[in-house]
Amino acid sequence: MGRDIEKLRALFLKFYASVPDKLREDIIALVDDKTYSWNSTFVEVNGKTALGDKILKKLEQIGLFEEG
């Protein structure tokens, strides 16, 4: 844990590219009592927003980027 935000961004974009279109509306994160789908997370992460960074940290915390 604790990877830098650019590394997390790159990992998320790699994961996102492999998610089938039909699953991209599925919720993947809950941040500040709001839910975020793959698509809404992509918009924030790709736009390099503060919210996107916060979502990436949450996804790392729940183990989305674990290898193996």
Label each region the model flagged:
Residues 13-44:
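Short amphipathic alpha-helical interface segments
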Residues 1, 13, 48-49:
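Short secondary-structure boundary micro-motifs
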Residues 60-68:
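A short, conserved structural fragment
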Residues 46-61:
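Short amphipathic alpha-helical interaction segments
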Residues 2-6:
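Inter-domain helical "communication" segments and dimerization helices
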Residues 11-14, 64:
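Intrinsic disorder/low-structure terminal segments
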